């Protein structure tokens, strides 16, 4: 019943009319409606909250003639429930009581004061500290897509113009947004499957002119040329929608969102969605973080450093100058052992990046200011540590750290050493910071001494030995006397409360003092909140410089982390070459070597202009996939400035990394395993270049032998002769090992294994040449296939091999392929393939039909 017909509102009680009106304004999210010490949910919201949160579903009387489904949760536990809801992509509007129940006629005045959505979180308790929290918007044009992401918790705003569906899929995989806005006309909803927090927005929110006005107003500029994005029309439309959504949900100024950058695919190595998934960069195939490249490389000191590292992993650089700048910084940190002390210093900084976002939104809490004070206090020591380093990139980062002595001194004077969680109850501002506040606090805090003196004086005056002076929050100050002695109280004692064995009284003097104290407490709290707001005003003029400080500290953290990982894990600095190629000596898989229970077998790889494709053969479980992945991961690590697990690595320029490794049904899109495999293969064949690194594993296994072999052969041939990409091509089709005899630049390598009787030992060592056999039956036995089945399979294998040897004149599959004549070009088909029917008039179409008839 959450869609409201305003004509029916009069049927409901005044309170429910108020609720339903607010719900109509926030129809696409749960409405937490404050009633006393609880947040209540009604109707469909109550049913959904009961299901999602496991809270009781009850009913609250009737309104409009029907029982009202209701669910509630205590206000003090709301953050825990919010965390659960945003994790599953649910948005919440929080409606608070802003009126005074004592003076209200009718329902207490209420207002939605906070909107919590997965992509607009800034509260520390609701965020994953080592993951970016991205809000995204996507807009589809006639050709291509506009894509924008915004991290409200840091202010990072990025747009991208994407030409193809595959590019958008890769960006979604790279950025992994927690909330996605899309237009009503968006036609690729299948790409959003698996993402939580999807929001369909009206088309007008993506209007180009409106978007430009919003962005110019946000950045305070006359145009967008300074950001280098003026021509990015589609992504600016997406960015405008994001900006409007954030303004609607945050309902405050957003000064920390002060720049926007453009993601250019040409600046980094392109990784498509399949590659990011198959290489398990920051997420494993089960959706977790364990046993990923990020899990191995991340020993950063700060959450902001961890988040930056993950962004680097997904954006390997192409410019060798930038890569070498990082390498030089890491080398110097390692050679001087400066990374050891730097790690501890950076760790004490905390998450300044997100603290600055909360300061900008004025939602920071007292402990945020305390952490900022600590970080600023550590800056001189950090600057001193870096002053001995001379690597250009480190020197540049040191300059961006800045100096903030005035701000640090202010926070030192203003904030107590261990502030409470919230400003609500006071106790945040340090004594001595403001004389007026000290005076009001003195009146309030002097109450204890006054009450002791009053109690002693009244005991002496009345002679009542059971007399006590006390205070509680309900009745205020009182004089308590035992019931047995209550007849002895003076006439100026006015009864305030009767208990079982006690009577409580108030006197004119005590009443006057109570009003004075309570007034001073209220005035002290009001003044403290005023001083608290002034702290924001003092700090925010330095917002941009403090954001630079946070970014520089995060990058220093990543570089220091690279030095530590190189030392701890035995990594070496890769060499960068201007010549295309990947040459690795004793390379290791960075993840497998960390989780393996046995010593990892290091292996080489050599790819260059004269050796562009390796046909990789060997048994299942022999290590083919591990070997191929380690080549890709070492190449990627080299391009983020990280040292690599190898004795030596020489890496040339790379434009893209492709992987076609493993496959499963894509049930959501209705695609079989073989269809998924062929789609990924087609993407590689269409987009790979001579500067690409391609990993192809078991192409063609999802269909018949002849079909599969034909596809594998043709794909390998196309990559070797037409594309010239650096390729590792793993296969169980041993016929493909004949390719090196037919094509230049193609070589065989294999993973070694030793067979003894019916057992097999995998050596995991890469050797030149083709494997002698596949050892499929031995692997099946290791997997636990029953002995009877293995014996029957051996018998059938012997029959097949014997028949092949005895069948005179028969051809092997590869011989059949090689014997086929080259296809003859058909002029009619050639002409037909060049026609675009959308561009033909009826007369032209008729003429073409006659021409095709003549050519056929």
Swiss-Prot record:
What protein name is recorded for this chain? DNA mismatch repair protein MutS
PROSITE patterns for the chain: DNA_MISMATCH_REPAIR_2
Going by the entry's taxonomy, the superkingdom of the source organism is recorded as: Bacteria
Lineage start:
Bacteria, Pseudomonadati, Pseudomonadota, Gammaproteobacteria, Alteromonadales
| Residues where ATP binds | 618-625
Q: What keywords would UniProt list here?
A: ATP-binding, DNA damage, DNA repair, DNA-binding, Nucleotide-binding
Q: Which PANTHER family match?
A: DNA MISMATCH REPAIR PROTEIN MSH1, MITOCHONDRIAL, DNA MISMATCH REPAIR PROTEIN MUTS FAMILY MEMBER
What the entry lists under NCBIfam families is as follows:
mutS1, PRK05399.1
GO molecular-function terms, A-Z? ATP binding; ATP-dependent DNA damage sensor activity; damaged DNA binding; mismatched DNA binding
Q: Name one GO cellular component term.
A: cytosol
InterPro entries linked to this entry: DNA_mismatch_repair_MutS, DNA_mismatch_repair_MutS-lik_N, DNA_mismatch_repair_MutS/MSH, DNA_mismatch_repair_MutS_C, DNA_mismatch_repair_MutS_clamp, DNA_mismatch_repair_MutS_core, DNA_mismatch_repair_MutS_N, DNA_mismatch_repair_MutS_sf
Q: What does this protein do?
A: This protein is involved in the repair of mismatches in DNA. It is possible that it carries out the mismatch recognition step. This protein has a weak ATPase activity.
Write out the similarity annotation: Belongs to the DNA mismatch repair MutS family.
**Name of the encoding gene:** mutS
Q: Which GO terms describe its biological process?
A: mismatch repair
């Amino acid at each position: 019943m959450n869609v409201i017909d305003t004509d029916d509102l009069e049927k409901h009680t005044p309170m429910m009319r108020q609720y339903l009106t607010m719900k109509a304004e926030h129809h696409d999210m749960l409405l937490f409606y404050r009633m006393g010490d609880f947040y209540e949910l009604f109707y469909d919201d109550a049913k959904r909250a009961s299901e999602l949160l496991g809270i009781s579903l009850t009913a609250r009387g009737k309104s409009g003639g029907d029982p009202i489904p209701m669910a509630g949760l205590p206000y003090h536990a709301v953050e825990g429930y919010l965390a659960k809801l945003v994790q599953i992509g649910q948005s919440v509007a929080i409606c608070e009581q802003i009126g005074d129940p004592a003076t209200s006629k009718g329902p207490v005045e209420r207002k939605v004061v906070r909107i919590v959505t997965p992509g607009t979180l800034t509260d520390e308790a609701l965020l994953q500290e080592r993951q970016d929290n991205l809000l995204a918007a996507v807009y589809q044009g006639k050709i291509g897509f506009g894509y924008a992401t915004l991290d409200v918790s840091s202010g990072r705003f990025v747009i991208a113009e994407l030409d193809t569906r595959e590019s958008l899929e890769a960006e979604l995989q790279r950025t992994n947004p927690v909330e996605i806005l899309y237009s009503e006309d968006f036609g690729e909803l299948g790409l959003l499957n698996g993402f939580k927090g999807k929001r369909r927005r009206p088309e007008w929110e993506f209007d180009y002119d409106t978007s430009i006005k919003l962005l110019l107003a946000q950045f305070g500029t006359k145009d967008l040329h300074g950001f280098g994005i003026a021509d990015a029309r589609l992504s600016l439309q997406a960015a405008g929608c994001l900006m409007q959504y954030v303004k609607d949900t945050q309902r405050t100024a957003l000064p920390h969102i002060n720049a926007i950058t453009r993601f250019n695919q040409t600046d980094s190595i392109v990784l498509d969605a399949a590659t990011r998934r198959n290489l398990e960069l920051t997420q494993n195939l089960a959706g977790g973080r364990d046993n990923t490249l990020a899990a191995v490389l991340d020993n950063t000191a700060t959450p902001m450093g961890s988040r930056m590292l993950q962004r680097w992993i997904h954006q390997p650089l192409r410019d060798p100058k930038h890569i070498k700048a990082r390498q030089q910084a890491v080398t110097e940190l390692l050679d001087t052992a400066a990374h050891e002390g730097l790690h501890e210093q950076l760790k004490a900084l905390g998450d300044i990046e997100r603290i600055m976002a909360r300061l900008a939104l004025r939602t920071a809490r007292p402990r945020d200011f305390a952490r900022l004070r600590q970080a600023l206090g550590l800056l001189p020591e950090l600057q001193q540590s870096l002053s001995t380093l001379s690597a250009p990139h480190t020197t540049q980062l040191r300059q961006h750290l800045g100096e903030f002595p005035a701000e640090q001194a202010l926070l030192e004077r203003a904030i107590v050493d261990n502030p409470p969680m919230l400003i609500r109850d006071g106790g945040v501002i340090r004594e001595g910071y403001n004389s007026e506040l000290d005076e009001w606090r003195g009146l309030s805090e002097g109450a204890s001494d006054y009450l002791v003196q009053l109690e002693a004086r009244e005991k002496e005056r009345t002679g009542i030995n059971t007399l006590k002076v006390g205070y509680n929050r309900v009745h205020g100050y009182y004089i308590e006397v035992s019931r047995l002695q209550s007849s002895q109280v003076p006439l100026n004692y006015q009864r305030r409360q009767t208990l079982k064995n006690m009577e409580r009284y108030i006197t004119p003097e005590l009443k006057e003092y109570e009003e004075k104290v309570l007034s001073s407490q209220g005035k002290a709290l009001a003044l403290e909140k005023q001083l608290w707001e002034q702290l924001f005003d003092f700090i925010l003029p330095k917002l941009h410089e403090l954001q630079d400080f946070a970014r520089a500290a995060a990058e220093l953290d990543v570089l220091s982390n690279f030095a530590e990982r190189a030392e701890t894990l035995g990594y070496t600095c890769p060499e960068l070459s201007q010549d295309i190629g990947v040459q690795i000596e004793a390379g290791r898989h960075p993840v497998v070597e960390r989780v393996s229970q046995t010593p990892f077998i290091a292996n080489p790889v050599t790819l260059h202009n004269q050796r562009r494709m390796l046909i990789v053969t060997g048994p299942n479980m022999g290590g083919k996939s591990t070997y191929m992945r380690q080549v890709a991961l070492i190449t990627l690590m080299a391009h983020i400035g990280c040292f690599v697990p190898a004795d030596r690595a020489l890496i040339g320029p790379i434009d893209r990394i492709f992987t076609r490794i493993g496959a499963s049904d894509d049930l959501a899109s209705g695609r079989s395993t073989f269809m998924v495999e062929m789609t990924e293969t087609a993407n590689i064949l269409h987009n790979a270049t001579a500067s690409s690194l391609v990993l192809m594993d078991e192409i063609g296994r999802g269909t018949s032998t002849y079909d599969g072999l034909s596809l594998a052969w043709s794909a390998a041939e196309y990559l070797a002769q037409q594309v010239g990409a650096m390729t590792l091509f793993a296969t169980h089709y041993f016929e493909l090992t004949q390719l090196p005899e037919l094509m230049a630049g193609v070589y065989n390598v294999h993973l070694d294994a030793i067979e003894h009787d019916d057992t097999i030992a995998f050596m995991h060592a890469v050797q030149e040449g083709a494997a002698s056999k596949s050892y499929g039956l031995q692997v099946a036995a290791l997997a636990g296939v029953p002995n009877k089945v293995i014996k029957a399979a051996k018998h059938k294998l012997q029959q097949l091999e014997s028949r092949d040897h005895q069948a005179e004149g028969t051809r092997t599959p590869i011989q059949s392929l090689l014997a086929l004549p080259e296809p003859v070009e058909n002029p009619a088909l050639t002409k037909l393939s060049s026609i675009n029917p959308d561009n033909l008039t009826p007369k032209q179409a008729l003429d073409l039909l006659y021409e095709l008839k003549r050519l056929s």
